[in-house]
Amino acid sequence: MESAAFKAARSPQDFLPLTPLSFLVLMVLADRDSHGYGIIKEVERRTDGSTRPGTGTLYTALQRLTDDDLIQEAEQRPDIGDDSRRRYYSLTALGRQTAQLEAERMANLVGLAIDSDLLPHTAGSSHGES
């Protein structure tokens, strides 16, 4: 078990690279608090169905993200009329910083892939223009 002092000293870089599912969860929670099923549906929507996390996989990721203080159980329920058994999650400040660093890391990798002609050229790119 980690001491509170060790956990408090952790920085966003300590969690990089994130797993794809962890990054997707943090992105969903960056927009709004959500419960597990809502996170699953939003991940499916954002990835056009290419990522469909199973409930066991998602809840394992949620537990790990909670243990790492990247997310927490939300203090308030966004929908008061919702099923009281649902646990809502929210992004912590550390979670937001970690997601931002991961996005920057991935953007740099995509830039390298474009430079290596591994991705189609994007509009406005200087590659291939005459």
List each model region and its residues.
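Basic amphipathic alpha-helical segments that dock to polyanions
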Residues: L58-L65
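Short, Lys/Arg-enriched N-terminal segment that forms or immediately precedes the first helix
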Residues: M1-D14
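Amphipathic alpha-helical dimerization/coiled-coil segments
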Residues: E2, L94-S130
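Short beta-strand/turn micro-motifs at beta-sheet edges
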Residues: S11-F15, E75-P78
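Beta-hairpin "wing" of winged helix-turn-helix
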Residues: T66-S84, S90
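Amphipathic alpha-helical interface segments used for dimerization/assembly
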Residues: V43, L62, V110-I114
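N-terminal helix-turn-helix DNA-binding core of bacterial DNA-binding proteins
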Residues: Q13-T57
